[in-house]
Amino acid sequence: MKIVVMGDSDTVVGFRLAGVHEAYEYDESLESVERARNKLRELLERDDVGIILITERLAQRIGSLPEVKFPIILQIPDKFGSIYGEDILRDVVRRAIGVELKR
């Protein structure tokens, strides 16, 4: 199964260096966001893709992400950090493993 990353150039370069199988770079233009939307649809149809990593900012621009069981779609922060903040992450961890994270 392949891991694919979609996002800004800095994020994509980092994941390429880490050995991700496929990486797709997009900017903030409407044309680029439409290309990303089409690429996401294409990736969802492929049997060889197991995980799609997409930056939170790109996911926000694409709009609602499809709710599918497979491949797994994970939103990741970009170089500017998470747009959702720590509260969302804390809630996800609490629901996933039943442990409350405190600072």
From Swiss-Prot:
Q: Does the keyword Transport apply?
A: yes
> What would be an example GO MF term here?
ATP binding
Q: What NCBIfam families has UniProt attached to this entry?
A: PRK03957.1
Topology of this chain in the membrane: Peripheral membrane protein
List the Pfam families.
ATP-synt_F
Q: Which HAMAP family does the record associate with it?
A: ATP_synth_F_arch
Q: Which organism is the protein's source?
A: Pyrococcus furiosus (strain ATCC 43587 / DSM 3638 / JCM 8422 / Vc1)
Give the lineage.
Answer: Archaea, Methanobacteriati, Methanobacteriota, Thermococci, Thermococcales
Q: Which family does it belong to?
A: Belongs to the V-ATPase F subunit family.
Q: What does this protein do?
A: Component of the A-type ATP synthase that produces ATP from ADP in the presence of a proton gradient across the membrane.
Q: What keywords would UniProt list here?
A: ATP synthesis, Cell membrane, Hydrogen ion transport, Ion transport, Membrane, Transport
Which GO biological process entries does UniProt record here?
A: proton motive force-driven plasma membrane ATP synthesis
Q: What is this protein called?
A: A-type ATP synthase subunit F
Alphabetical GO CC annotations of the entry are: plasma membrane
Task: Name the principal localization, coarsely classed.
Answer: membrane
Which segments does the entry list as coiled coil?
Answer: none
